[in-house]
């Protein structure tokens, strides 16, 4: 089997270019993310696909579709135009955050579900399961804290003359907004446990990083909900866009870090699934009584 390491290095370089473009709010190359995932797919094919052979290409295809869909627009095309902003309705759009969460998490969730469903069953490693259970509790707990914090802020600061939305509508919108990210986090942790049970520790580390990506995605989904000002200014948003103070030179540090961690997760997953083979898969069993 030919070495695919140059493809993996090129994919990593494109991932760095993509994250750098997000960091400075000016794409280095608008095709960087698409090419990074395409090179990962080529690396998987060259290095040898695991069984079942369709799983890794199917997962990467979902990621490629999302990367093409969200590819930055060409700044040199399209005329400039005025945009007129009008005040919207006072009520909170209940589904705005949920739709934003699906947009952010659907491709990663599909990839994780495909790899989890296609992976062969192996024994559970109790220490790994225990760590994953703690991590899952943290993901769910963070989502609950965010919802409760918004609820308390909206309830404490609501004024009759504010003309804002009802507290129940606000809490419902935020509760729906966190669901896609929580689902991604739990699925990624389940995938990490399954891969660890197969002895694929590198790929398992990639799945853990994918679960970490769910946290800023959760805050971004809440940020898409048009909350009243008094409900939006809460201190529990540890992974929101302003968690790292932006600057003129680096206006988007949190989105850039999120993209870097996400693409690193994909690199580790693909490298761990298609790279090293387990000894039980690579070598035939020795006859009984024979010496190695």
Question: Where are the predicted features?
Answer:
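N-terminal "leader" segments that precede or initiate the main folded domain
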Residues: 4, 8, 27-34, 47-50
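Cytoplasmic membrane-interface segments at the C-terminal ends of transmembrane helices
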Residues: 1-4, 40-61, 110-132, 187-207, ...
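Alpha-helical transmembrane segments
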Residues: 3-20, 57-66, 133-139
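Membrane interfacial helix motifs at helix-loop boundaries and amphipathic/re-entrant anchors
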Residues: 17-36, 68-103, 141-180, 217-261
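Mid-membrane cores of alpha-helical transmembrane segments in multi-pass membrane proteins
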Residues: 10-14, 32-43, 53-66, 82-84, ...
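Hydrophobic alpha-helical membrane-insertion segments
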Residues: 59-70, 132-146, 204-225
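Long amphipathic alpha-helical segments with strong coiled-coil/leucine-zipper propensity
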Residues: 110-149, 163-169
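C-terminal transmembrane-bundle signature of multipass membrane proteins
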Residues: 177-292
